[in-house]
């Protein structure tokens, strides 16, 4: 008697240490990949990261202060980033309807299209990889990534506070 095929392939045994090592490999590959993507777009990594946040915000346009907070740079530094992104045709600045002293940052549609064209083949491969996982496994992955991001951000903030206290 043969058993029915499994709907999803069995997973190799892993330990937290092995998972952390795999995560470190992914982070390193992602960092190198991000540098290469930025070069192809004639941007530096920080500018590309800011542009990604602008894209992610969609119609809920961000302020310069929002970007500075997300990328953990000063508002002065983010002004330079926005100047470069605007000169390169990636963003435009719009007056804030609630506060005339502030501006909101909008992505230029043709620049979004260029970025998507570059990233789309990679994301298609990731989508294909997700097809190997059950909905429950994907839910676990999404939960883990979300919680790990929260931990990473909290630890980075803790390090900043320690540094400020030491000064």
Give a label for each model feature.
Residues 1-41:
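N-terminal leader segment of winged-helix/HTH proteins
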Residues 14-17, 41, 45, 62, ...:
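Residues at secondary-structure transition points
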Residues 34-73:
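N-terminal helix-turn-helix DNA-binding core of bacterial DNA-binding proteins
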Residues 61-103:
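Canonical helix-turn-helix DNA-binding module
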Residues 86-139:
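Charged, amphipathic alpha-helical coiled-coil/dimerization segments
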Residues 119-167:
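Terminal interaction helix/tail motif
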């Amino acid at each position: 008697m043969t058993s029915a095929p499994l709907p999803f392939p069995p997973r190799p045994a892993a330990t937290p240490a092995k998972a952390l090592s795999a995560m470190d490999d992914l982070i390193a590959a992602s960092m190198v990949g991000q540098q290469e993507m930025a070069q192809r777009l004639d941007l530096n990594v920080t500018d590309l990261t800011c542009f990604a946040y602008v894209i992610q915000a969609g119609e809920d346009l961000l302020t310069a202060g929002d970007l500075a907070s997300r990328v953990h740079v000063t508002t002065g530094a983010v002004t330079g980033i926005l100047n470069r992104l605007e000169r390169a045709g990636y963003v435009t600045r719009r007056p804030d309807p609630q506060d005339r002293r502030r501006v909101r940052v909008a992505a230029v549609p043709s620049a979004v299209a260029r970025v998507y064209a570059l990233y789309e083949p990679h994301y298609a491969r990731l989508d294909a990889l997700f097809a190997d996982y059950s909905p429950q496994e994907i839910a676990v992955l999404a939960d883990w990534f979300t919680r790990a991001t929260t931990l990473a951000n909290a630890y980075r903030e803790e390090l900043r506070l320690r540094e400020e206290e030491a000064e």
